[in-house]
From Swiss-Prot:
Organism, scientific name: Protochlamydia amoebophila (strain UWE25)
E.C. numbers: 6.3.2.8
Gene name per UniProt: murC
Alphabetized UniProt keyword annotations: ATP-binding, Cell cycle, Cell division, Cell shape, Cell wall biogenesis/degradation, Cytoplasm, Ligase, Nucleotide-binding, Peptidoglycan synthesis
EC supergroup of this enzyme: ligase
A single GO molecular function term of this UniProt record: UDP-N-acetylmuramate-L-alanine ligase activity
UniProt name for this protein: UDP-N-acetylmuramate--L-alanine ligase
InterPro entries attached to this UniProt entry: Mur-like_cat_sf (IPR036565), Mur_ligase_C (IPR004101), Mur_ligase_C_dom_sf (IPR036615), Mur_ligase_cen (IPR013221), Mur_ligase_N (IPR000713), MurCDEF_pg_biosynth (IPR050061), UDP-N-AcMur_Ala_ligase_MurC (IPR005758)
Length: 454
């Protein structure tokens, strides 16, 4: 690969990772975004030229211009690239080009991609594979979401949300699950969604390195292909004897005609037991030593915005999680509840996108049952046009009608003040959502530390 690459919307987690990989290959990179963040600052330090806002003047003839599904076709830089007859590549097309140079290991599925791919990437790097990776979150151990390695393996997230995962032809893969999310990309049809996953798995060149969740009935089309993992007796890799103490898991795994007792994983929740089993099995199939895998699992620090510890004040703990789909919220709260036992758990939820709320109505009623209090704030639209009759109010009503957990609306601008007045010593607060609710913990802690006491 050579030439100059320009990223429209370079600050996004997927785009910034690809830009970082190109920079590490000593390629010329520029980009633009409407706002600067710490990710962009890191890219600038690595040699990228980045502009604030969008302008056709940022596009130069002969550049390869990268865009994502979030970039509209009337974007001035997109239009300028077309007018200058620049090579235009969707983010997934660039990732496909990069992964073709290696033995690529894709992680796909509706939920769990980022944690699973990050754990897999960390496991391989800790085993001195010098693998490449491009994941959807920042791995604290590397302070990065991407790396260009000299080894022959490349771990990456294959995003199903916009159907772009069909552009990949990986060497091996993990399929975590299939759930009814992003159906607007699949003609609003679950059948089309499942058929797309069937097509993706048919594109894997080494099915011996395909691992899929055997507990997910949507994945039954994979019976007899690759290796399944889960809790069921029918799974090739079976989880048993689970024990969770605080924010750590311990479990047994049986697979490959062998038992692997007392695996320790520095994560919480049933979903992460499944993620861990998938990574353990795939790593073993790649001849990574059991001792190395165990060592990594014990030391793995998770991913930013995945049940991330944000701080505490007088024994009140603040956590933050990216969960915004009902299934993700429920599993996250279940894991936290097991970790904190009887402590009061306050869930602060920021609904994400009007279209997702509409698609998921009927699923919110009981997902907060492991919380003691629920605050629901304004919808984070993520650029979507509001849908008439769809707002946070429908979610609040659904919870009120189906659960005994107290739920109330709090405007986004008032969340910090409300929490600083409401919380008590030993409470655990978790913010949930893919938007700016991630800032609420620091906002609240700042108020508390500056004299706003219990």
């Amino acid at each position: 690969m050579r030439g100059h690459y320009h990223f429209i919307g370079i600050g996004g987690i997927g785009m910034s990772g690809l830009a970082r990989i190109l920079l590490q290959q000593n390629l010329s990179v520029s980009g633009s975004d409407i706002a600067f963040n710490y990710t962009i600052e890191g890219l600038i330090k690595s040699g990228a030229t980045i502009y604030k806002g969008h302008s056709p003047s940022y596009i130069t003839s002969g550049s390869t211009v990268i865009y994502s599904s979030d970039i509209k076709t009337d974007n001035p830089e997109y239009l300028a690239a077309k007018n200058l007859q620049c090579s235009l590549l969707h983010r997934a097309e660039l990732l496909a080009l990069l992964t073709r140079q290696k033995k690529s290991l894709a992680v796909t599925g509706t939920h769990g991609k980022t944690t699973t791919s990050s754990l897999l990437a960390t496991t391989l790097l800790e085993a001195n594979c010098d693998s490449s990776f491009a994941v959807g979150g920042i791995i604290p151990q590397f302070q990065s979401n991407a790396k260009h390695g000299l080894g022959d393996l490349f771990v990456f997230e294959a995003d199903e949300s916009d159907r772009s995962f069909l552009k990949y032809f990986p060497y091996g893969a993990i399929v975590t699950n299939i759930d009814n999310d992003h159906l607007n990309s699949y003609e609003n049809s679950e059948d089309v969604l499942i058929q797309s996953f069937q097509q993706f798995t048919s594109q894997i060149s080494s099915p011996n390195h395909l691992f899929w969740c055997g507990d997910d009935t949507h994945l039954k089309f994979l019976n007899g292909i690759g290796q399944s993992y889960g809790f069921g007796e029918h799974c090739n890799w079976r989880i048993s004897n689970v024990f969770q103490k605080d924010f750590n898991l311990e479990f047994d795994l049986e697979g490959n005609e062998k038992k692997y007792p007392s695996i320790k994983l520095n994560l919480i929740g049933r979903h992460n037991l499944l993620n861990g089993a998938a990574v353990f099995g795939l790593a073993m199939s790649l001849n990574i030593s059991e001792a190395s895998i165990r060592h990594t699992f014990e030391r793995f620090c998770g991913v930013l915005r995945r049940c991330e510890y944000k701080g505490e004040f007088e024994n009140t703990i603040f956590l933050d999680d990216y969960a915004h789909h009902p299934t993700e919220i429920q599993t996250t709260l279940e894991g936290i509840r097991k970790a904190i036992k009887s402590k009061r758990l306050i869930a602060v939820f920021q609904p994400h996108r009007f279209s997702r709320i509409k698609d998921c109505l009927g699923m919110y009623g009981k997902i907060f049952n492991n919380a003691d209090e629920v605050f629901v704030t304004d919808v984070y639209g993520a650029g979507e046009t509001p849908i008439e009759g769809i707002s946070q109010q429908q979610i609040i009503q659904e919870i009120s009608e189906n659960s005994s957990v107290p739920v109330k609306y709090v405007p986004r601008t008032a969340l910090g003040h409300k929490l600083s007045e409401f919380i008590q010593p030993l409470d655990v607060i978790v913010t949930l959502g893919a938007g700016d609710v991630t800032k609420v913990a620091s906002e609240t802690l700042s108020l508390l530390e500056n004299g706003k006491r219990f």
